Amino acid sequence: MKVIFLADVKGKGKKGEIKEMPTGYAQNFLIKKNLAKEATAQAIGELRGKQKSEEKAHAELVAEAQSIKAKLAEEATLVEFTEKVGPDGRTFGSITSKKIAEELQKQFGIKIDKRHIKVDSPIRSIGLIDVPVKIYQDIAGVIRLRVKEG
């Protein structure tokens, strides 16, 4: 019996795969537990349509991520922070990924999740700093910061 997997089943198949399975195993285990459904012509058509729409959505997200990366690469995209500085040259407050995300949204209208901004430790020094950011899956960019004395 041909089945379409609705979820990953260890040793049998992954979600979205169409495979030939023993009839008893398919009916009594896979279909009852909603791990798979019978591969009828209609179900296969639905699966193909769903895969096409997922590919289209993925392509749109990649295009959006590429445009964000291009915006970040422009010379004009320099996120500025004005912080109070102590006598040792370190800022009183630290600049975290949350602050960077908020300033990027406020200054340039670029929305990036703070969890994707890779700050090893909070920034406490003044000057120009490059911070890596993961925009989408394998698309990464760099946010340029200028921290100046206020």
From Swiss-Prot:
PANTHER family, alphabetized: 50S RIBOSOMAL PROTEIN L9 (PTHR21368)
Xref: InterPro entries: Ribosomal_bL9, Ribosomal_bL9/RNase_H1_N, Ribosomal_bL9_bac/chp, Ribosomal_bL9_C, Ribosomal_bL9_C_sf, Ribosomal_bL9_N, Ribosomal_bL9_N_sf
Name of this protein: Large ribosomal subunit protein bL9
NCBIfam families listed in its UniProt record: L9
Function: Binds to the 23S rRNA.
GO terms, molecular function: rRNA binding; structural constituent of ribosome
Keywords: Ribonucleoprotein, Ribosomal protein, RNA-binding, rRNA-binding
